[in-house]
């Protein structure tokens, strides 16, 4: 293979994985530990990407897990921002966003899930094990919502 052909090959590598931010709140402790009601668990996910250098991107998956009892009493609130630095080169421009919003979160999610479960357990609660997430379907749904919003605003979607 020539040098030019090697240089044009797609590159995807993990440079670093790390916890960017971790917070845990138990605002109603210690009384909340005496409550025997079953709480409602709510999980929210958010993915953000930024260009760090040429062909190097930071992708951050933020997982927020809240647990509430009736009457809107918070049991706990955990937020983990699991980040990674990825080298992504020679990927077609149209595919770059999908790689960062599907491929990278798939790599980050198991680490975020472990951090969430560990924080909740260390706070004195039963662990919450997050179910696997289909980031591809989330990305496609987001793209459809953006296209619908653009159509309502009278704009043409960018392809």
From Swiss-Prot:
Molecular functions (GO terms): unfolded protein binding
Major localisation: cytoplasm
Keyword Chaperone: yes
Xref: InterPro entries: SecB (IPR003708), SecB-like_sf (IPR035958)
Pfam families registered for this protein in UniProt: SecB
Localization: Cytoplasm
One GO CC annotation: cytoplasm
Top-rank taxon, per record: Bacteria
SUPFAM superfamilies (UniProt xref): SecB-like
GO biological process: protein folding; protein tetramerization; protein transport
Keywords annotated in UniProt: Chaperone, Cytoplasm, Protein transport, Translocation, Transport
Keyword Secreted part of the UniProt annotation: no
Family: Belongs to the SecB family.
Biological role stated in the UniProt entry: One of the proteins required for the normal export of preproteins out of the cell cytoplasm. It is a molecular chaperone that binds to a subset of precursor proteins, maintaining them in a translocation-competent state. It also specifically binds to its receptor SecA.
Complex formation: Homotetramer, a dimer of dimers. One homotetramer interacts with 1 SecA dimer.
Protein name, per record: Protein-export protein SecB
Organism per entry: Aromatoleum aromaticum (strain DSM 19018 / LMG 30748 / EbN1)
Gene encoding the protein: secB
């Amino acid at each position: 293979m020539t040098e030019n052909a090697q240089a044009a090959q797609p590159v995807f590598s993990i440079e670093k994985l790390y916890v960017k931010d971790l917070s845990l709140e138990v605002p109603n402790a210690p009384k909340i530990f005496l409550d025997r009601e079953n709480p409602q668990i709510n999980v929210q996910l958010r993915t953000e990407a930024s260009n760090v250098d040429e062909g190097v991107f930071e992708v951050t998956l933020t997982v927020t897990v809240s647990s509430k009892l009736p009457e809107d009493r918070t049991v706990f609130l955990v937020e983990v921002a699991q980040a990674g630095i990825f080298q992504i080169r020679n990927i077609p421009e149209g595919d770059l966003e999908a790689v960062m919003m599907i491929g990278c979160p798939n790599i980050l999610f198991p680490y975020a899930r472990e951090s969430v479960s560990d924080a909740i357990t260390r706070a004195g609660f039963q662990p919450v094990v997050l179910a696997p997430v289909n980031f591809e379907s989330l990305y496609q749904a987001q793209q459809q919502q953006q296209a619908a919003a653009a159509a309502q605003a009278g704009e043409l979607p960018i392809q």
